[in-house]
Amino acid sequence: MLDAFAKVVAQADARGEFLSNTQLDALSSMVAEGNKRLDVVNKINSNASAIVTNSARALFAEQPQLIQPGGNAYTSRRMAACLRDMEIVLRYVSYAMIAGDSSVLDDRCLNGLRETYQALGTPGSSVSVAVQKMKEASVALANDLTGITQGDCSALIAELGSYFDRAAVSVV
C-alpha cells in the first residue's frame, strides 16, 4: 500500500503539482479497503483457536476413523500435529488476506504440502475437509459485519474463500 502512495506522490512531485482530488479519492478508497481487510484478518486471528478446534471437532465427527486406534489423528501426539497443521494453514491464509496476494500462502505453506502428507500417509482428502471447515467458520465470522469498517465486503469475503479453496485443493 505504501508503494501506491509513494508512486502517486512521486508522479505529482515530478509534475510539480498537488495531488488531485481523483488521486486523493483513489488513495482514500485504498485506505478504506485496507481497513476492511485488517478488520477481517483481526476477526480471524482473534478467533483462530476456536476456528481450528471447532473445525477439527466437526471433521472428527464426520470421519471418526481418524481418531480411532490406527487413525491418522490417534494418539495425542498425532492430534497435536493435526491441530498444529490446521493452525499453520489458517495463519498463512490470514497472511495472504492481509497482503491481498496468495504468494505467501503458496510459497511458504502449500508448495510441497501434498507430497509431505503423502510421504507421511496423511489422507489429503481429510486435510482438505478440515480446510473447508475452517473456511466456513472464517467466512461466517467475516460475514458478521460487527466491528468491520463500513462498506461492501463481498469481494473481500470471496477473496478469503479463494485462499481456503486454494489450500484445500493443494493437499489432494
From Swiss-Prot:
GO biological process, one term: photosynthesis
Amino acids binding (2R,3E)-phycocyanobilin 1: C82
N4-methylasparagine PTM sites in chain numbering: N72
Subcellular location: Plastid, Chloroplast thylakoid membrane
Stored SUPFAM superfamilies: Globin-like
Changes after translation: Contains two covalently linked bilin chromophores.
Gene3D superfamilies named among the record's database cross-references: Phycocyanins
Entry GO CC: chloroplast thylakoid membrane; phycobilisome
UniProt cross-references to InterPro entries, sorted A to Z: Globin-like_sf, Phycobilisome_asu/bsu, Phycobilisome_asu/bsu_sf, Phycocyanin_b
Annotated keywords: Antenna complex, Bile pigment, Chloroplast, Chromophore, Electron transport, Membrane, Methylation, Photosynthesis, Phycobilisome, Plastid, Thylakoid, Transport
Binding positions ((2R,3E)-phycocyanobilin 2): C153
Membrane topology listed for this record: Peripheral membrane protein
Job description of the protein: Light-harvesting photosynthetic bile pigment-protein from the phycobiliprotein complex (phycobilisome, PBS). Phycocyanin is the major phycobiliprotein in the PBS rod.
Assembly: Heterodimer of an alpha and a beta subunit, which further assembles into trimers and the trimers into hexamers. The basic functional unit of phycobiliproteins is a ring-shaped hexamer formed from two back-to-back trimers contacting via the alpha chain subunits. The trimers are composed of alpha/beta subunit heterodimers arranged around a three-fold axis of symmetry. The phycoerythrins also contain a gamma subunit which is located in the center of the hexamer.
Family listed: Belongs to the phycobiliprotein family.
Protein name according to UniProt: C-phycocyanin beta chain
Organism: Pyropia yezoensis (Susabi-nori)
Protein's gene: cpcB
